[in-house]
Amino acid sequence: MAVWIQAQQLQGDALHQMQALYGQHFPIEVRHYLSQWIESQAWDSIDLDNPQENIKATQLLEGLVQELQKKAEHQVGEDGFLLKIKLGHYATQLQNTYDRCPMELVRCIRHILYNEQRLVREANNGTSPAGSLADAMSQKHLQINQTFEELRPVTQDTENELKKLQQTQEYFIIQYQESLRIQAQFAQLAQLNPQERLSRETALQQKQVTLEAWLQREAQTLQQYRVELAEKHQKTLQLLRKQQTIILDDELIQWKRRQQLAGNGGPPEGSLDVLQSWCEKLAEIIWQNRQQIRRAEHLCQQLPIPGPVEEMLAEVNATITDIISALVTSTFIIEKQPPQVLKTQTKFAATVRLLVGGKLNVHMNPPQVKATIISEQRAKSLLKNESTRNDCSGEILNNCCVMEYHQATGTLSAHFRNMSLKRIKRSDRRGAESVTEEKFTILFESQFSVGGNELVFQVKTLSLPVVVIVHGSQDNNATATVLWDNAFAEPGRVPFAVPDKVLWPQLCEALNMKFKAEVQSNRGLTKENLVFLAQKLFNSSSSHLEDYSGMSVSWSQFNRENLPGRNYTFWQWFDGVMEVLKKHLKPHWNDGAILGFVNKQQAHDLLINKPDGTFLLRFSDSEIGGITIAWKFDSQERMFWNLMPFTTRDFSIRSLADRLGDLNYLIYVFPDRPKDEVYSKYYTPVPCEPATAKAVDGYVKPQIKQVVPEFVSASSDSAGGNATYMDQAPSPAVCPQAHYSIYPQNPDPVLDNDGDFDLDDTMDVARRVEELLGRPMDSQWIPHAQS
């Protein structure tokens, strides 16, 4: 029988556990409508630790989305209309969530299927053997759920004991009242005659002695019941505190760490639904125990009996108040972080959420949340509970928001949608620290009333550190500060301390994560790429990655000190590489057509045994965000040629594929792939109209063509003398032609004696020509101008 069919038959807590597996990360409706397809896929065959399996994971994601879309299309009728919209929405949601990290979808569904199978097995035979899909996370989640299973009967047991104590005490009070009535009867005996008084007095004395003895024994019994109940509550609170520590200090902190790494491009932090279900169970059990303790205290006040129980109850009451206080304050979290590079006068958003809002009825009196930006120093003072002035470091517009309770999802949250940092007040900088190294944080504050104003909590939570910029040119260095902080922040740190030095392998992991996210590619940094980066950073010639494994990288090396002989830092160079790949070269990087991380000498070594016309693309050492072509062409002058680097500006005018297509003497993409086979699908289609075709205004439209003057004869031959092309080279010179005489000729060659360009000596005239092409052109620029 299909697992889903059996899962739908679960009852009680098993059903709740199954429902808690689903949420925004994977809606239960998707599981229901695609149950057969989901269970027929080989989720378990994918190795989550093998990056090469990403292709399989992507295929499964695409298949899931396609199945959802097909299911949506087949919905008809009035009832089917809403379902069609909902399933279509889920298809888009899953695509957006897992497109960059399909492995997380596999991990998610494996976790769901494993737990469904476990719950079904437990329901069928009461056993829970470890299945093939069991992992450390599942085992820990199982342990948490088992602890809840222990807490429920324990809490019910103390409830029963409390009722027993209450009944016993009520009967004791009745008997105590009887004792008082007997004493009153003694006072009335004086009115009787001696014989009758003696008879009645003897009977009353005997009754009083018996009752006093019973009351004395029963008082001891009551005291014993009270002590036993208090001891049971002490044990329950120990178990509750341990469970709360696991959930808040382990699971929630891990979620926050995943959220922090997601800021560096790591996988999404995942849904809060499971965490919320645990926190709500905690809140429910804690509140039940607190009410029991309060009732026990009331019983003691109602009938005081000397002994240790008052002190014990006061202690457990204080303990459970501390526990519930920690739960409420710790579960006030930032679900959606504000941007960590925050530009003034720019709209930004954030979302805060209280994971126990529904269970503790906080939403009955919706609280308001206020956001302020504070300095690192004030953040330190807040965490130390030091009294500080309400001193903010700037002004945020639209910084107040009322929390809303969403009945369907059971979430209590506040969505700040239109905040804007109007101004910022900076602190005095330390030493060489720049403004882009100064960290701030957004402080979210509120006040929650729990249990009908029985308890009132002042709650605060801090965002991840933010770096404030006033101009886009600061974004690069601000991102470096955020990357370093997110990657290397240690648990429980003082805000916002990070190590000044880290091991090179740690930085490699952070760079690779950021690279894949920024370039939006599954092709990350290889071992060879990391060796190249290490050589650049450490100014070393070693080609063995192991030689760098014990070396440390300081923050100054990363983004404060310039690389040797350059006017930029290591990070600025690396960020430039990501920028040009992301904006213009992503498909070529994904195709493996860009080698990228090699220096000039390495490029020559790779090309030396290749046929003429073999070329490779490498990132420029001399220009940030530049990429250059190195190729082999054995001539009388030299064997290796290096073209002046192209940048984002160049590719916004003419694409890399078209530029390579123009250079017919570039034949093979290293190592031996035909150029057209690799790049032809990216060429801009050539219009079918003849060259003499006229535009609406009567002019022939010019076209840009990539030319290297040293190879101009080859280019001219291949162009077939087509006069509608304007030759363009990424160089200080333009190929001489009479009707392009608006600029003076530059006699210097395009390539220097080493086959390289000197970027600082001359002006790139061709780029100015390209700029002019976007403006109204003088008739002298138009070949065959029409009158």
From Swiss-Prot:
The modification Phosphoserine is found at residue 128. It is found in: Cytoplasm; Nucleus. Pfam families: SH2, STAT_alpha, STAT_bind, STAT_int, STAT_linker. The keyword Transcription regulation applies. One of its GO terms (biological process) is defense response. CDD domains: SH2_STAT5b (cd10420), STAT5_CCD (cd16855), STAT5_DBD (cd16849). Tyrosine phosphorylated in response to signaling via activated KIT, resulting in translocation to the nucleus. Tyrosine phosphorylated in response to signaling via activated FLT3; wild-type FLT3 results in much weaker phosphorylation than constitutively activated mutant FLT3. Alternatively, can be phosphorylated by JAK2. Phosphorylation at Tyr-699 by PTK6 or HCK leads to an increase of its transcriptional activity. Residues 589-686 form the SH2 domain. Belongs to the transcription factor STAT family. PANTHER family: SIGNAL TRANSDUCER AND ACTIVATOR OF TRANSCRIPTION (PTHR11801). This is Signal transducer and activator of transcription 5B. The lineage of its organism: Eukaryota, Metazoa, Chordata, Craniata, Vertebrata. The gene is STAT5B.
